[in-house]
């Protein structure tokens, strides 16, 4: 499991896509739906972009995994969730939710989950998130905007 975190407009979605092998099957859950993300599906035939309401996301995610073959015939290599903040926006429940995602990844043992977290200036990832075993954290930095005066 890989967790990509950073402030908005810092290239988290782009980083998530750079981790994906375009020759392998991928589910991309676009919860913060962006027009640019939908265009990615047209460029890459192995990328299926889906938008879900936040009500019962874990059940919907498991249904999609089973729909792609479940334990035995599963051809998924990656599951990207962009951004998790739309599912769990409170800091207390986020580690528990991430550990449930890790359990799903371990249970099916066929794909890697890439989770994107939008960290605001008041929402820092602390030691509570480091307790999940086998998780790689990648931080993106916000680029400074250049102002050109003509």
How would you label these PLM feature ranges?
Residues 43-47, 71-72, 143-150:
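P-loop/Walker A phosphate-binding loop and immediately adjacent motor/lid segment at beta-alpha junctions
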Residues 61-74:
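Conserved alpha-helical scaffold flanking the Walker A/P-loop in AAA+ ATPase domains
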Residues 72-93, 112:
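Conserved P-loop NTPase "ATPase switch" module shared by AAA+ and STAND
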